[in-house]
């Protein structure tokens, strides 16, 4: 053994003795090569994310205009984690959580941990304590813009507080990122949109809370309403586009189109029908949709209703879509029950 190798081995032993086993290792020795994920609750979004869902132990930012469906997208992720036996938490800084709507989306509100903090510092400290416990699988912070620093709350209305929120977020993310990775918690930060003043060229839109969240996020999703969905004269929902604007675990810039129905959330039938039609799993002839020469219905809404009533057929079609894109179902379910991840 060369002197260099002996010196390296000695240094590695010293590091492990000082900081614990696993504090340094060769990249190939890592037990987990493949990114462990949890489904987003939307098949179209799972495909757009490229790895079959949200990566565990990472920070996700979901941003977009008001009433575009940001909270709906995050509540579907909570419902999916709970369905797989995981623990979820919701930091409601906006004080606008609707338990009735959450329940309709499949969230078990009896098991969901909810905090409505008074200040930004309090909200982020609660989030840190939950992450460090190692017992929470997903935590949603709604929203970054509502995480108001204590100094701003205690000050007067006209006081200037330049950069306070950005500093708060920067400090919090420095502390949180390592703990999130170790505990395999998915941390979803919901954010709003602001306009930069005096921008002549380029996009004037920006997100509040400084640049730290943009850097620390593994995935950034932009949620925007595309068009209204009508049934007769009634508006029953919105067609929504979710664009993956940043992705460190798969190619970015993919777009998922979903129907967000009022009082129901993301329409599983709608996304399955659209994706199956694109892949020719479901055939579309004129206004008729058919599968294996069996007619599903005339028109998109009738076909969606047919799939809603025939869940076995719907899940069979979903299985073929997942198979085509190489996505396995419940990829993160076994991780939630693996206590070794919490060591």
From Swiss-Prot:
Single annotated GO MF: single-stranded DNA binding
Signal peptide positions (record): none
One of the GO biological process terms: DNA recombination
Superkingdom to which the source organism belongs: Bacteria
Annotated localization: Cytoplasm
GO CC annotations on file: cytosol
UniProt keyword Cytoplasm present: yes
Keyword Cytoplasm: yes
Keywords in alphabetical order: ATP-binding, Cytoplasm, DNA damage, DNA recombination, DNA repair, DNA-binding, Nucleotide-binding, SOS response
Chain sites annotated for binding ATP: 64-71
Primary location recorded for the protein, binned into one broad class: cytoplasm
Known role: Can catalyze the hydrolysis of ATP in the presence of single-stranded DNA, the ATP-dependent uptake of single-stranded DNA by duplex DNA, and the ATP-dependent hybridization of homologous single-stranded DNAs. It interacts with LexA causing its activation and leading to its autocatalytic cleavage.
NCBIfam families: tigrfam_recA (TIGR02012)
Similarity comment: family membership: Belongs to the RecA family.
Protein's name according to its UniProt entry: Protein RecA
Organism in which the protein naturally occurs: Bacillus cereus (strain ATCC 10987 / NRS 248)
